[in-house]
């Protein structure tokens, strides 16, 4: 399936502002891009340590804008769902390059929520069932559309029982890490294919966990497999 994706940012500032724009598909799906268009000031392109496609630019004083659009090929099938055989590894058996996906981070304070995670999910079977239990609980107990700020972390989302899609993803990552499951945050484009149009026309966020021998997609906001995800950024 060919999909049109894109975004536009309008910016006003009294002074010039150095910035990094991460709005293009992740390097892992770069080969699926059929055509891409960048409109705005010239920007240096680079790939960061997590494989994110970045543009480094300086937004001038006054009003300015930039936009990105692309045609990309996506699978017509919904997200692949892991089977029960995709096991959760013991921490001592994990590859060393996955260990940092277990550590707490700025938005995913798993050290603070470890007790709560084990209280809620400690009795669930390990692996796929545990991650799905996390998604089910967040989907059922965290209200979507509750305003948060860019600095809101998982503990604050849990305390106010509400948030936006990024907050659902942060909380999912946090609970999984507290349970010893490597997890990472993902932002991206998610079209309304085969579902009613979402009233929130924006980027989406979900998370991935390492089970068996690969990363798997989980989405606590919608909590069902979806068609056409295009990852932009992955991180801690």
Which stretches of residues belong to each language-model region?
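Intrinsically disordered, low-complexity N-terminal segments that are enriched in acidic
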Residues: 1-85
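Generic structural "secondary-structure junction" signal
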Residues: 5, 59-61, 74, 109, ...
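Secondary-structure boundary elements
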Residues: 13, 76, 82, 92-163, ...
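A broad, low-specificity signal for short, low-complexity segments enriched in glycine/proline
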Residues: 26-35, 144-147, 166-171
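Low-complexity, flexible helical/coil segments
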Residues: 41-48, 55-57, 102-111, 218-224
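Glycine-centered loop/turn motifs
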Residues: 62, 124, 196-198
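A charged helix-plus-loop insertion that forms the helical arch/lid used to bind
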Residues: 87-91
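Hydrophobic/aromatic-rich core segments of domains that either
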Residues: 136, 167-236
């Amino acid at each position: 399936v060919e999909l049109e994706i894109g975004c536009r940012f309008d910016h006003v500032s009294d002074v010039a502002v150095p910035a990094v724009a991460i709005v293009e598909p992740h390097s892992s799906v770069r080969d699926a891009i059929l055509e891409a268009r960048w409109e705005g000031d010239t920007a240096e392109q680079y790939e960061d340590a997590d494989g994110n496609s970045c543009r480094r630019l300086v937004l001038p004083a006054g009003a300015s804008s930039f936009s990105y659009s692309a045609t990309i090929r996506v699978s017509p099938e919904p997200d692949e769902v892991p089977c029960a055989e995709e096991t959760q590894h013991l921490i001592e058996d994990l590859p060393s390059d996955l260990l940092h996906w277990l550590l707490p981070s700025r938005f995913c304070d798993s050290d603070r929520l470890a007790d709560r995670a084990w209280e809620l999910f400690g009795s669930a079977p390990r692996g796929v069932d545990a991650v799905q239990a996390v998604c089910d609980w967040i989907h059922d107990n965290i209200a979507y559309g509750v305003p948060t700020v860019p600095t809101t972390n998982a503990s604050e989302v849990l305390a106010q029982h509400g948030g936006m899609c990024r907050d659902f993803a942060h909380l999912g990552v946090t609970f999984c890490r507290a349970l010893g499951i490597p997890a990472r945050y993902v932002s991206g484009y998610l079209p309304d294919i085969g579902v009613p149009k979402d009233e929130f026309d924006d980027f989406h966020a979900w998370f991935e966990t390492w089970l068996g021998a690969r990363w798997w997609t989980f989405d606590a906001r919608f909590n069902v497999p979806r068609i056409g995800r295009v990852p932009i950024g992955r991180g801690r």
